[in-house]
Amino acid sequence: MIRSHEHLARKLGIPFRDPGLLRNALTHRSAEGVNNERLEFLGDSVLGFVVTEYLYQRFPSADEGVLSRLRATLVNETSLARIARELELGEYLILGSGELKSGGYRRDSILSDALEAILGAVLRDQGIDACRALILTLFERPLSALSLDDWKKDPKTRLQELMQGRGLPLPVYTLIDQSGLPHDQHFRVRCEVPLAVEPCVGEGSSRKKAEQQAAENMLSRLSDQSRFRV
């Protein structure tokens, strides 16, 4: 059963004047009625603008190339899907029967598109200031952890170097699930390292993306352990 969209609005802290905009943002193209593609287009643009503005102000000495790479570490399908999962966005999506049966509510591409569509809906309903505030809230953790070195190394490389620097075995990645149609696959990968008691799981539209997300999730977990600096 789809959870109440009013509940999601409260979770976001957005009092929508037009609740229909939020419903549209959560409606996948596989469902009947107005879908979220136009709002996604708008949300993608405002997200890029707000993150670019933030980076420009925070790193005044960084050149255009560095700023672009930093933005790419923040604005991508994997990071957006991770935030969408933190919001449990899949439980609010309106999907067609085929997408519902195939687990579309778990798919990175659908989750990230829906999150961008929500940002577009907030922009339309509340204006740029409210939309900017929401983006900075949703991205607060990755933004606060950002450094000028982030664009140089991907999560798998950083995790591998962390293990090597401590003389520990390298991370182990295991494919635990693969589903979806041939043109729209969904992968789940488990990452295990000696520093963590429990493994971390990553998801993505390819095994490579799932491994990168699993590594990033593991780095986030280790960064919460005060004796490790990731």
From Swiss-Prot:
Q: Which InterPro entries match?
A: dsRBD_dom (IPR014720), RNase_III (IPR011907), RNase_III_dom (IPR000999), RNase_III_sf (IPR036389)
Cofactors per UniProt? Mg(2+)
Q: Which residues form the active site?
A: D44, E116
Q: Reply yes or no: does the keyword NADP apply.
A: no
Pfam family name, one:
dsrm
Q: Which residues form the RNase III domain?
A: 5-127
Q: What molecular functions are annotated in GO for this chain?
A: double-stranded RNA binding; metal ion binding; ribonuclease III activity; rRNA binding
The terms describing its cellular component in GO are: cytoplasm
The subcellular location is:
Cytoplasm
Catalytic activities: Endonucleolytic cleavage to 5'-phosphomonoester
Q: What is its EC number?
A: 3.1.26.3
Q: Which UniProt keywords apply?
A: Cytoplasm, Endonuclease, Hydrolase, Magnesium, Metal-binding, mRNA processing, Nuclease, RNA-binding, rRNA processing, rRNA-binding, tRNA processing
Q: Where do the DRBM domain residues begin and end?
A: 154-224
Q: Does the keyword DNA-binding apply?
A: no
- Out of the domains of life, which is the source? Bacteria
Whom does it interact with, and what assembly results?
Answer: Homodimer.
Q: Which NCBIfam families match?
A: RNaseIII
Give the HAMAP family listed for this entry.
RNase_III
Describe the function of this protein: Digests double-stranded RNA. Involved in the processing of primary rRNA transcript to yield the immediate precursors to the large and small rRNAs (23S and 16S). Processes some mRNAs, and tRNAs when they are encoded in the rRNA operon. Processes pre-crRNA and tracrRNA of type II CRISPR loci if present in the organism.
Name of protein: Ribonuclease 3
Species source reads Methylococcus capsulatus (strain ATCC 33009 / NCIMB 11132 / Bath)
The UniProt gene name for this protein comes to: rnc
